[in-house]
Amino acid sequence: MDTSEPQESPKSLSNVKHIILILSGKGGVGKSSVTTQTALTLVNKGFNTGVLDIDLTGPSLPRMFGVETKQVHQSSAGWVPVSVYNNGQEKNEENKRGNLSLMSLGFLIGNRNSSVVWRGPKKTAMIRQFLKDVVWSGGENNVPLDYLLIDTPPGTSDEHIAIAEELRWANPDGAIIVTTPQQVATADVRKEINFCKKVNFDVLGVVENMSGFICPHCSECTNIFSSGGGKELSEKLDLQFLGNIPIDPSFVEMVEMQDNDQNDGKKKLVDLYDDCELKGIMEGIVDKVLEQQHPARF
């Protein structure tokens, strides 16, 4: 695998209009959940969306989208991502969803219980290959991908340097920073924001995840942890605060229901998400990102 520093944008991204990274200062803040729901929201808004899961230590997105048994295919042009949702119909007012595809190391390691015990050079080489060799398109007709979300490892490491080097010429829109309300999480987020400044990634905004708990019985939201840490950090650093996302047990149930026998119609997460309490919250967060109107890459 090639480990040399690139001098141009990866050709695999030439079919992608917008690139957004999802970053977190530390693990366990629900970054992959935010990535999943951001993708679902974009699809429901009619955008053809791709998700690149390069969190090599915990590639959980195949499980989140209910496609962990699917296989990645190799074409003459490169790896073909797994189709999570294919609208397959002409868009209209009643049917405006986009398509959704996913590429993840989880498809390549076979056993979901296997751990990835790799040294830094092998990790960075795999990340470079993911960014250069995946053939992104918005469906079977090779239409452009409107948005590519890149779910990154937590913290700042060699993997992040490799990501920054590969995307140096790709002109990404920027990064969404995910934190939880606690001070220990927001302190690490400062490091992530400093990293973005050093590698010239715009910070699109901060999301405070796990901000409260939605009762599954009465739907009332209770602050079981501290709250407001993400908003306070945003104000101090003059960044846009995108919103609070509470813990919603129903979303976890929807993820698990995809493989459940009770799911008679075998609904995908895209369909199940219509009934999620978090849907409206995520629409507000995504709208704030879209309102920034970053120009398309082509």
Curated annotation (Swiss-Prot):
Its main location: cytoplasm. GO terms for biological process: iron-sulfur cluster assembly; tRNA wobble uridine modification. Gene3D superfamilies: P-loop containing nucleotide triphosphate hydrolases. Coiled coil: none annotated. Heterotetramer of 2 NBP35 and 2 CFD1 chains. PANTHER family: CYTOSOLIC FE-S CLUSTER ASSEMBLY FACTOR NUBP2, NUCLEOTIDE-BINDING PROTEIN NBP35 YEAST -RELATED. Component of the cytosolic iron-sulfur (Fe/S) protein assembly (CIA) machinery. Required for maturation of extramitochondrial Fe-S proteins. The NBP35-CFD1 heterotetramer forms a Fe-S scaffold complex, mediating the de novo assembly of an Fe-S cluster and its transfer to target apoproteins. Required for biogenesis and export of both ribosomal subunits, which may reflect a role in assembly of the Fe/S clusters in RLI1, a protein which performs rRNA processing and ribosome export. This is Cytosolic Fe-S cluster assembly factor CFD1. It comes from Debaryomyces hansenii (strain ATCC 36239 / CBS 767 / BCRC 21394 / JCM 1990 / NBRC 0083 / IGC 2968) (Yeast). The gene is CFD1.
